């Protein structure tokens, strides 16, 4: 899926749906319908008889059908396609998984994908609950999740490996058969690796229950083993099971942040079959850093140093932090920097000497951040961020600062690079450092590749199967009405138009054909998206970074949430937002993340009488104590919604060696009165539209308007 221009525009929806349809059909894709109008609510059974006849005076109408006839040149071909599409409409809808706020926790993220949020474990139990012991089921699941690594352990300990291969392949084929049962053979075939496509298809569609076929099936498996291909086959079919267990992955923002593996998550997604993302505030911060926004660069580095997680910066993207370390030691070497000591959960991971160096670097980049932010606030007075230019409020002789009219003592008054007369001016050494950091981000090829992926698969919001997806907030007035927000001088928007135009502005920062002035403004605007009060990715009164570092009084640390967060429990407010975005249907929802759900304090992630679901459960290990859990997955399958609540994941190594899985608790949120079919989904609407056009083509064939086999 490649989103080139807008956020969920009608044209984009058609383009994306077409690509999804290609997964469902073996035929060549039909020509896209240009007007993008919503599909008619009529059923396919009565579409043909009451349709409007073809208008012979409308040349485009006939021209379109002639173009369509190139793919379906005969009555037989068009009829066959209608039969195929109608059959697809009657399949169960695919399983969607929703995740939010991963924050660089790559091991937990990858494990949740591998075990399909516990669904594979349930499938194994459904199949073998009465025939395999618990320990054997656990071993089989571990093999499915981590086939390469588990095979090495098995081969080192199994006395009769060929016997193990034979039994295990039978088990894996049974699991694969179950998870593939809701899809067409065509779609399953496309998920199969080329080397084993035919073999897996044969094994899926034949069973040993039939005495006539038992020898055939066992013969295939014996040959796989005797030719030395058992390992490769097992790895291949395990990957197929993983892929077919999740039809579509939705990420509601914040892949990036404090965790060590955001780059690993992006590498995983680059290979993933179907996914989309609604950008979060941390994602746009990294986008801004790549675009060249120096304040964003400082924020990205500061957050990594705050949690002593430099792996993504240094190992993932090759960002050179040596100049920062050198500058920090020279400038702050005699500063205790106590308030800048990193937050380290595992003290054995970072020794004291390294923590001390990180603290120096942390302060150096924080001061640079405040300067670069101040310069942008000065450059853009229309953003009304002057109150965040806190260097102006410091009495450098007394070591105090005035916040909201109250004078507070500073924890530290050591600002060797800040001039009281011109506090936001960079020293020559700071400027040289900033230039080097800027260059390092701009030339990171891997970061370019990953941000390109975010742009291709992402947007500010998405509407999918009557669900409105966005990361954080919709700016609201106190009365719950949509708030007008100025994103460019003289250009204000609200609701859907606001998110759409912010998405366009984000893309302008990376498009070579953008005007230089527009591109620079878009690059600057990333900072406002990160921490501006009216940003739909932030929506708080302020980001109290300076206060947390330098002021003891915790009252100054308070960040007051915007009206959306105050009103989102109100069902009528949620309904009005859904109406404004054009989300219809009796079972419509808002799904978002951003603000951790404090389960340990009794907070419920389901709000507004079930119409709003907040799925930030704290994937990041830093939030585990705060939320009491280790993240959520929202699962939307053919029978309804389930919320899967995860407990902390130890490590992939423990999962492989000890068979430890993420312990999860599943809650039924909303169940359908009947099993939902493809016909009930967005893809189904598009398939119905295609059926209508094919029926019009049949009409044209049968009434001599267009000749079969491409004739005129």
Residue ranges of each PLM-predicted region?
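Feature recognizes metal-dependent phosphohydrolase scaffolds
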Residues: 2-5, 30, 36, 40-712
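Cationic, low-complexity basic patches in intrinsically disordered or flexible, solvent-exposed regions
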Residues: 20
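Short terminal hydrophobic/aromatic SLiMs and anchors at protein ends
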Residues: 8-13, 33
């Amino acid at each position: 899926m490649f989103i080139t221009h807008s956020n969920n525009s009608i044209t984009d929806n058609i383009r994306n749906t077409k690509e999804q349809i290609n997964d469902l059909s073996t035929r060549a894709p039909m020509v896209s319908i240009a007007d993008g109008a919503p599909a008619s609510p009529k059923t396919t059974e009565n579409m043909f008889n009451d349709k409007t006849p073809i208008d012979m005076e409308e040349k485009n109408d006939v021209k379109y059908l002639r173009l369509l006839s190139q793919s379906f040149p005969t009555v037989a071909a068009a009829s066959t396609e209608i039969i195929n599409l109608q059959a697809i409409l009657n399949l169960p809808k695919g399983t969607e998984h929703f995740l939010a706020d991963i924050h660089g926790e790559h091991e937990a993220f990858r494990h949740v994908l591998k075990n399909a949020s516990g669904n594979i474990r349930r499938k194994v139990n459904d199949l073998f609950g009465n025939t395999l012991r618990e320990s054997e089921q656990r071993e089989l699941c571990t093999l499915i999740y981590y086939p390469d690594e588990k095979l090495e352990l098995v081969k080192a300990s199994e006395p009769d490996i060929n016997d193990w291969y034979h039994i295990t392949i039978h088990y894996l084929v049974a699991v694969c058969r179950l998870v593939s049962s809701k899809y067409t053979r065509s779609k399953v075939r496309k998920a199969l690796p080329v080397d084993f496509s035919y073999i897996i298809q044969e094994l899926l569609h034949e069973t040993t229950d039939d005495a006539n076929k038992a020898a055939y099936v066992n013969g295939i498996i014996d040959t796989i083993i005797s030719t030395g291909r058992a390992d490769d086959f097992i790895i291949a079919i395990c990957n197929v099971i993983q892929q077919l267990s999740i039809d579509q992955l939705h990420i509601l923002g914040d892949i990036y942040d404090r965790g060590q593996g955001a780059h690993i998550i992006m590498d995983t997604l680059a290979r993933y079959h179907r996914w989309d993302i609604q950008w979060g505030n941390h994602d746009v911060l990294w986008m801004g850093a790549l675009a060249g926004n120096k304040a964003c660069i400082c924020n990205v580095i500061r957050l990594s140093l705050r949690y002593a997680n430099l792996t993504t910066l240094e190992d993932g993207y090759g960002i050179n932090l040596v100049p920062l370390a050198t500058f920090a030691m020279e400038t702050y070497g005699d500063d205790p920097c106590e308030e800048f000591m990193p937050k380290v959960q595992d003290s054995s991971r970072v020794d004291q000497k390294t923590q001390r160096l990180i603290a120096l670097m942390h302060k150096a980049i924080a001061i640079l951040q405040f300067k670069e932010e101040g310069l942008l606030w000065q450059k853009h007075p229309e953003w009304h961020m002057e109150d965040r230019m806190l260097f102006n409020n410091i009495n450098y002789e007394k070591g105090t600062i005035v916040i909201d009219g109250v004078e507070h003592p500073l924890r530290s008054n050591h600002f060797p690079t800040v001039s009281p007369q011109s506090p936001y001016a960079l020293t020559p050494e700071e400027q040289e450092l900033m230039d080097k950091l800027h260059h390092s981000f701009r030339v990171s090829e891997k970061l370019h590749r990953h941000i390109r992926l975010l742009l291709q698969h992402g947007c500010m919001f998405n509407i999918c199967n009557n669900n409105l997806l966005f990361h954080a907030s919709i700016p609201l007035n106190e009365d719950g009405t949509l708030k007008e927000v100025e994103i460019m001088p003289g250009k204000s928007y609200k609701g859907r138009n606001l998110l759409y135009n912010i998405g366009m502005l984000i893309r302008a920062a990376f498009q070579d054909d953008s005007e230089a002035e527009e591109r620079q403004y878009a690059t600057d605007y990333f900072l406002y998206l990160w921490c501006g009060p009216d940003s739909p990715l932030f929506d708080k009164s302020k980001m109290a970074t300076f206060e947390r570092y330098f002021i003891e009084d915790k009252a100054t640390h308070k960040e007051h949430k915007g009206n959306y967060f105050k009103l989102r429990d109100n069902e009528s407010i949620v309904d009005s937002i859904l109406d404004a975005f054009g989300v219809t249907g009796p079972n419509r929802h808002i799904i978002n993340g951003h603000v951790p759900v404090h389960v340990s304090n009794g907070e419920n992630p389901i709000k507004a009488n079930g119409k709003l679901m907040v799925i930030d459960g704290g994937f990041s290990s830093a939030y585990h104590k705060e939320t009491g859990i280790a993240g959520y997955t929202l699962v939307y399958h053919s029978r309804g919604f389930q919320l899967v609540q995860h407990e902390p994941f130890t490590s992939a190594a423990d999962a492989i060696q000890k068979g430890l899985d993420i312990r999860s608790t599943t809650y039924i949120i909303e169940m359908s009165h009947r099993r939902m079919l493809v016909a009930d989904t967005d893809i189904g609407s598009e398939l119905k539209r295609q059926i209508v056009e094919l029926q019009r083509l049949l009409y044209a064939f049968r009434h001599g308007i267009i000749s079969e086999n491409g004739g005129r």
